[in-house]
Amino acid sequence: ILAVNEQLGTLMYRDPEITRWNTHQFDAFKVIAHDAFLITIALALEEERFDLVESALRKSYLVQEYEGGGNRPATTDFSVFRQYAQSLHHRNQRLKLNRLSVDADLLKEAYPKGSIPSFEALMQADLVLFL
């Protein structure tokens, strides 16, 4: 499970073969990688798999970064999955939503009451990751 999250993390950055891109091009992968990691933690907490949560929080993730023309593999902690998706900010402004977190709104919409995991479980996981 954690290896899949690690692979998703590599999609958040531009491949060196891509020479033309815009700043929002990889935002969808940033949101997907964050949501996947959050769901992993939420499900582990619900199943009381604290060993998995601990492993996820202690693991060093290898993420290949290609920003600025570089090609640098970097090991980092789980915070790599919480990347700012600028396109969500622009959506908030463009639609005059006045929301604090469009990402949270999308999660709430995708995980209504009765879903697995529940939105409440995702909020709990987010709090654990914040602490």
Where would I find each of the regions flagged by the language model?
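Long, low-complexity, intrinsically disordered terminal regions
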Residues: 1-131
